[in-house]
Amino acid sequence: MRVALLLLLVAALLTQYPATAAPQAQGPGALAASALDFEYFRTRVQPIFLAKREGHTRCVSCHSKGTPMRLQALSPGAATWNEEQSRLNFRVVQARAVPNSLTSSKLLVHPLLAEGGGDFYHSGGKHWNSFLDPEWQTLANWVCGRKGNEKLVELTGACGAAD
């Protein structure tokens, strides 16, 4: 009897939400859609994913294949992404960025050396030894909602003062 009542209750609750409803974003990056700037992402953040670094492959080499942060593959012969691909990349990357939170943003801590403030995880290696690296600073400025090239003077949890 209790099982039947429980099933009836669950069925009643499920009918309140149509199957065609769009899922709501959840998790730390859920507010990122409104807080992060697409144009800054397109012109300053995306080029970092294409940059060649000594001792490493380009981010796009791995992140356009079987990784959770999957970027769009470049079109044949293209040197960068088109508008539609950039918007898809933006959606993927913003889920790894927590606006105004440097140490909660996987985008910032995964590829940063642990001794420099990063975490242990990033199977693609550590691309930056310090949060003072110019590329890392560009990513941090995006997460902090800054439009310029302000330099962070210290690595804290929240976006703080700049030079």
Explain the meaning of each model-derived region:
Residues 4-15:
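Bacterial N-terminal signal peptides
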Residues 17-163:
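Aromatic- and Gly/Pro-enriched helix-to-coil junctions and flexible linker segments
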